[in-house]
């Protein structure tokens, strides 16, 4: 089964920018996806590395929007000019490519979640291979990312909202398979989040 791994990294980082403007910590004023960790790699590079390590031999797709991303090895990098219209536009940018690549499912994560583990990506990929319609990672019982979407549910996805797959999961709970994961799904939404990530 051909499963594409997708990293959505197109948002404007509005909450982080507000936090950055208010901070007095000397943190460089850059987009959160480009903020650098203790090892010199950016937030999005960490998120991508985990995805790549946990994705087997499937295609790697990265969708950018508000900011130009660094080159990411072995990835097809797409720009979504409609990124400001909501996360679903970025998801559809990736799915359009997945259709052309004859993929039967996608596993989708976010570029501002650098602590998701490679094993979490693998677990979602395995769930899709075993026939899940929608797979969702859970951390201590909470549904978070990554999320797996079989080709059969793609027509149900919204085209221009910020909900991604959440509305489909609410409308079709019987299609959802929860996949327990062990990483950390916290995102970087503030300077405090960034500094905490530096310490983790």
Spans of features found by a protein language model:
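Short beta-strand segments
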Residues: 8-10, 63, 109-111, 137-140, ...
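SAM-dependent methyltransferases
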Residues: 1-6, 16-17, 53, 74, ...
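Residues at secondary-structure transition points
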Residues: 25-38, 42, 78-89, 115, ...
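Short, conserved active-site loop motifs that form the nucleotide-linked donor/cofactor pocket
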Residues: 75-76, 176
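Short, polar loop motifs at secondary-structure junctions
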Residues: 63-69, 173
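N-terminal glycine-rich phosphate-binding loop and ensuing alpha1 helix
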Residues: 1-64
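Conserved alpha/beta core of the MobA/IspD/sugar-nucleotide pyrophosphorylase nucleotidyltransferase superfamily
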Residues: 1, 5, 155, 160-200
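Conserved beta-loop-beta/alpha segment of the NTase-like Rossmann-fold superfamily
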Residues: 76, 84-151, 155-157
């Amino acid at each position: 089964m051909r499963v594409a791994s997708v990293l959505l990294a197109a948002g404007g980082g509005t909450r982080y920018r507000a936090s950055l403007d208010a901070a007095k910590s000397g943190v460089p004023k850059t987009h959160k996806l480009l903020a650098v960790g203790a090892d010199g790699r950016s937030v999005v590079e960490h998120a991508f590395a985990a995805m790549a390590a946990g994705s087997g031999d499937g295609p790697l797709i990265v969708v950018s929007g508000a900011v130009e991303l660094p080159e990411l090895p072995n990835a097809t990098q797409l720009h979504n000019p409609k990124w400001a219209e909501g996360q679903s536009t970025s998801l559809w940018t990736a799915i359009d490519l997945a259709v052309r690549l004859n993929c039967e499912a996608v596993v989708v994560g976010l570029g501002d979640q650098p602590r998701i583990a490679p094993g979490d990506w693998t677990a979602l990929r395995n769930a899709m291979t075993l026939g899940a319609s929608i797979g969702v990672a859970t951390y201590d019982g909470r549904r978070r990312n990554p999320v797996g979407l079989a080709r059969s549910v793609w027509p149900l996805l919204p085209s221009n909202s910020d909900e991604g797959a959440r509305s489909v999961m609410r409308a079709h709970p019987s299609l959802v398979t929860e996949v327990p994961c062990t990483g950390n799904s916290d995102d970087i939404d503030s300077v405090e989040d960034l500094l905490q990530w530096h310490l983790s």
